[in-house]
Amino acid sequence: MAAVAGAPGPGEGGESEQDSETIPGERRLGRLSCEPMEAELDSERRSLVRCEPCCGMEIDTQENAGPDIEQLGDSGAEQVYGIHTNSEFVSVSAVDYMGINQGQIAPENRKARSEQLPREPFLQRQPIPMILSEVTDSGIYTGLCLEEAKFSSNNGSEASLNYSECDNRSVGTTEGSVVTSGIDSLIPGSEVQVTLDHIIQDALVVSFCHGNRIFSGVLMDLSKRFGPHGIPVTVHPRREYKNKPVESIQEESKSFHEEPLVKSEENSPEDVTPIQQLENCKVQNLWTTKPPPLFHEGAPYPPPLFIRDTYNQSIPQPPPRKIKRPKKKIYREEPTSIMNAIKLRPRQVLCDKCKNNVVADKKEIRKVATDSYKTEEGKRRRHETVTTVNKKLKTDHKVNGKSQNESQKRTPITKVTNLAHGRGKVVKVPSQTSAAKTQMHTKEVLQNKNMDHVKAREVLKMAKEKAQKKQKVTTSSKNAHSKVHFTRRLQNSSSGTLPPRLRIKPQRYRNEENDSSLKPGLETLRSSKIGIKPQTRYSATRSAGETPSEIQSPSNGPEEISSEMQDTNVCVPPEEQDLQQTLGKRGSKSNITVYMTINQKKANSSSASVCSSDSTDDMKSSHSECSSTENFDFPPGSMHAPSSSSSSSASSKEEKKLSNSLKIKMFSKNVSKCVTPDGRTICVGDIVWAKIYGFPWWPARILAITVSRKDTGLLVRQEARISWFGSPTTSFLALSQLTPFLENFQSRFNKKRKGLYRKAITEAAKAAKQLTPEVRALLTQFET
């Protein structure tokens, strides 16, 4: 190992003096032999340069003539070293400079100084301080040991360099770090010098040269919670000991840390290998550091990738969440469907109409018992009163003369019956010779109630007495409220069979303001006579629901419905052979039956058009208004002429034929869809709201639709058979009592009701959603 002090080289004397003058403190370190490619650091540009091979110089001569390694400047921690040659300078990088083949270094220049390159912006790559260790000789490669150079120079021209022997022990550097021989000698926590290659956002790509090995890696910024580009980084928080004091924890960690050291001292130093030393160091580091807590408040939930990669480590977990369990709602339900069906039944079983029928039957039975008890006592008295009345009528006819007798022979009788809950009154209104007298007489008859009532009561009692002997009276009272019925009068032995009677019921919802439409007809009927008009044609236009207000009179005495139906055999004689038609006008509070005589010859289905409209409480369907013009012919004749048995038998046969011809047929048909009078189209399978008395609006499904019409095409009723949701029961309701389910949901739904009501609503909603227009069209494609 030869010192290079005083070895000038080519142009060394002048150059060294100039360098010493221009750059104060410059010191010659030594000569370095290298391969033909030589490197040097320019003192002025302060950058690494590559020296091209000298012209005309061979490799052998070039190997001996190596460049000079000099210290170009000393500025505190940053020291710059350069290689001086006479060749031209070419810029080189730090990697090229560090990658010089160390095998061609001359043996006398084994010891060299490690370079600390300056951190200047013009450098391509900024070096970072690192520690180099000596590499043992292997083949042509020579180990390099770096150490601090000691200088002793008094002037700038001569300099002496003292080198210490290179051995395997660690050498202290200027940075205060420790470097040992071999890669196994590297200890975690020591500082090394790396080279910065690339800067990528939050990551740094660095390289580290250790002897003939080059290591590279990525350094990530840990100031953020997770690494760059979504790569998470585990940062374990410090364990917080809440139960144990700090001193006891430190003593435990120290005692555990000392145990492996004692074991290592017991073993011989020759048996311990570097790998075992490294493993011991790792174990010591793991146990000396405090493990992270298993659970602490405020810890973020770890990403799932780290849970998979860290099975045996404690990971911070968030506090356990409270699991909300819904409370079970207990519904008190009946075990069987029978109880559900019973629950759906209304509290009031009978409607208003049925109640009236039942009450009327009960009252009628009671009155029949009381009347039958008094029948025997007043039998003679009643018979005598009837004979006296007949005698008075005969004497009146004789006094008045033949003209009056003929004029009164065929005068029609208008009988008005006022029915209210089984009680009624019969008023006989005979017609007069003039219209003015008829109007005055009508007022007088309505005012003289007592006299007319006594006569009518006697006639009714006598008729009831005869009827009880032959037939039961209760049969006729049950048919009093039938919808459209044809009844034959009860036969008497003396009077024979009366003509059939048609009872017509209007709708209840009509107002009674237009009740005066029948007034002119009734006045004309009363004023008809034989002398002036032999055949008076009576025309009356009637609308459904209109009730004559003049004829309505309060009932002064209770009478039975059945007796009122039977009293016509006394008022109208059978030999007149006239049809009687009952026009039953039912108002909102009372029933009024008007009897009018019709000519037998012209009273048929073609000459007299009959208008019938059915209205019941349970069937409130909206029908088209029934209005028609009816023509009645009233033949001249007298009143109450005596009859014979032959005429009564002949009239009974003729009346049977007429009754068959006057019967109005009614047809019913099941349809798949129907249009209501208000314009709505209802189909089979629709989900609707339905209402029953005593129940809320309930969802139902239409099973069938029945439309009833007369032979003339007049609409009578529109009825639907429905099944209730949540119940196995079915009902028959009018289409007017049904409303669409989805359209009227907000107005019909009751939020306060629960239980079966909610279940029925849920089922109906599901069924309504499934009922698409396509399904509805398929259901209504074919009519049944």
From Swiss-Prot:
Bias regions of kind Low complexity — which residues?
605-614
Family annotation (SUPFAM superfamilies): Tudor/PWWP/MBT
Sorted UniProt keywords: Nucleus, Transcription, Transcription regulation
Q: Which Pfam families match?
A: PWWP
Domain PWWP, by residue range, is 684-744
Q: Does the keyword Nucleus apply?
A: yes
Q: Which GO terms describe its molecular function?
A: chromatin binding; histone H3K36me3 reader activity
**Region Disordered, residue ranges:** 1-32, 244-272, 463-567, 605-654
Q: Which residues form a coiled coil?
A: none
**UniProt biased composition (Basic and acidic residues):** 244-266
Q: What PROSITE patterns does the database record attribute to this sequence?
A: PWWP (PS50812)
| Compositional bias segments (type: Polar residues) | 536-556
* GO biological processes: chromatin remodeling; eye development; head development; neural crest cell differentiation; neural crest cell migration
Consequences of knocking out this gene: Embryos exhibit lack of retinal tissue combined with a reduced head size. Defects in neural crest stem cell migration and differentiation seen.
Q: Name one GO cellular component term.
A: nucleus
Localization per Swiss-Prot or TrEMBL: Nucleus
> Is Electron transport a UniProt keyword of this protein?
no
Q: Function of this protein?
A: H2A.Z-specific chromatin binding protein which plays an important role in the neural crest cell differentiation and/or migration during early development and is essential for the development of the head and eye. Acts as an adapter between distinct nucleosome components (H3K36me3 or H2A.Z) and chromatin-modifying complexes, contributing to the regulation of the levels of histone acetylation at actively transcribed genes.
Q: What is this protein called?
A: PWWP domain-containing protein 2A
Supply the source organism for this entry. Xenopus tropicalis
